[in-house]
């Protein structure tokens, strides 16, 4: 877990606890190519070291494939999906509009796409304000399933509904995904939670901290200082007496400010 991940975790934890809610932990481990052995155990250890104790059992998406398949089948029965082998390279960044390209890689695993419309999806983000997107024109028919794996968009929509998520707090890099998720929620007759997208932590090169950019993982040796920096980034600078306090004390102070 890098510093940007910690900021997102702290932001969502404080928001949930300020409202007297539960903070649920979901491990998004369905992308087998990107899953690193031992990473989940390390994340759980880091969260506990920083006083970020979750409520209930940890949810592993890799154990919920049947729930995602059922949602996909429901959309298929409504005639809202189609099979496609177009690659990202073939699309060259253009929205997919049910017109597959001629340069199809027939060796690639088939993807299932959702048919989109020209409907504009609008919502009010607690931090970013009003957001509107025409999914059909700006994104196109997006992937729900590829090969043996569900897409991120489908999985999180199913999980948010299944576990009664009332508020989603996450990084602003996922703001653009939210209209797609609301679109799926409406097609599946699922409730739409409230959303709050946090500012991103950027590296010295101006890029978002991420595993792909080789962001350094946080340690637990200087966790009091690291927690203070995370809270400061979120606008909750602890007072001087708490500057070197244990993370759980700093979190309790931040929660009480609400």
Residues covered by each model-derived region:
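N-terminal Rossmann-like or analogous alpha/beta NTP/dinucleotide-binding catalytic cores
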Residues: 1-95, 172-190, 242-243
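Hydrophobic alpha-helical context, especially transmembrane and signal-peptide helices
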Residues: 3, 70, 150-151, 197, ...
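Non-catalytic terminal extensions that flank enzyme cores
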Residues: 18-21, 119, 207-258
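Low-complexity, flexible helical/coil segments
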Residues: 58-65, 190-193, 204-207, 229-237
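Short secondary-structure transition/capping segments
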Residues: 62-78, 99-110, 237-255
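Active-site cores that bind ATP or allylic diphosphates and position pyrophosphate for catalysis
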Residues: 83, 88-220, 238
């Amino acid at each position: 877990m890098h510093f940007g991940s910690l900021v997102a975790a702290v932001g969502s934890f404080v928001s949930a606890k300020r409202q007297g809610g539960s903070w649920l932990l979901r491990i998004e481990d369905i992308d087998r190519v990107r899953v690193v052995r031992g990473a989940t155990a390390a994340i759980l250890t880091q969260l506990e070291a920083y006083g970020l104790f979750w409520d209930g059992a940890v949810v592993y998406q890799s154990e919920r494939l049947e729930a995602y398949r059922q949602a996909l089948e429901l959309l298929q029965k409504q005639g809202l999906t189609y099979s496609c082998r177009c690659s990202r390279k073939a699309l060259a960044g253009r929205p997919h509009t049910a017109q597959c390209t001629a340069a199809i890689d027939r060796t690639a695993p088939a993807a299932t796409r959702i048919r989109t419309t020209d409907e504009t999806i609008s919502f009010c983000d607690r931090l970013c304000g009003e957001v509107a997107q025409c999914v059909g024109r700006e994104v196109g028919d997006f992937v729900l399933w590829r090969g043996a794996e569900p897409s991120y968009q489908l999985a999180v929509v199913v999980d948010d509904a299944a576990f009664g998520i009332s508020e989603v707090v996450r990084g602003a890099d996922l703001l653009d995904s939210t209209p797609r998720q609301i679109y799926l929620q409406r097609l599946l007759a699922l409730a739409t939670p409230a959303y709050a997208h946090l500012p991103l932590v950027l590296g010295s090169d101006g890029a978002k901290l991420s595993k792909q950019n080789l962001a350094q993982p946080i340690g637990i040796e200087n966790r009091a200082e690291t927690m203070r920096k995370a809270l400061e980034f979120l606008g909750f600078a602890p007072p001087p007496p708490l500057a070197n306090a244990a993370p759980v004390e700093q979190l309790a102070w931040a929660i009480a400010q609400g």
